[in-house]
Structures are given as C-alpha cells and as structure tokens.
Amino acid sequence: GYKVTYFAIRGLAEPIXLLL
C-alpha cells in the first residue's frame, strides 16, 4: 500500500529537514 511508502518517506524526510 502507498501508506507504508508515505510513512517511510515522512520518517526519513522529517529529521532531514530538521537537520537542514
């Protein structure tokens, strides 16, 4: 399902973002 991909991307993108 796309939700798994969505949450995986969110989980990776949020800390990156915060670091940048």
Swiss-Prot record:
Lineage: Eukaryota, Metazoa, Ecdysozoa, Nematoda, Chromadorea
Top-tier EC class: transferase
GO molecular function: glutathione transferase activity
Organism: Ascaris suum
Catalytic reaction annotation: RX + glutathione = an S-substituted glutathione + a halide anion + H(+)
Keyword RNA-binding attributed: no
Function according to Swiss-Prot or TrEMBL: Conjugation of reduced glutathione to a wide number of exogenous and endogenous hydrophobic electrophiles.
Record domain GST N-terminal: where: 1-20
Enzyme Commission code(s) on record: 2.5.1.18
Entry's family note: Belongs to the GST superfamily. Sigma family.
Residue positions binding glutathione: 6
The entry's keywords: Transferase
The protein's name: Glutathione S-transferase 2
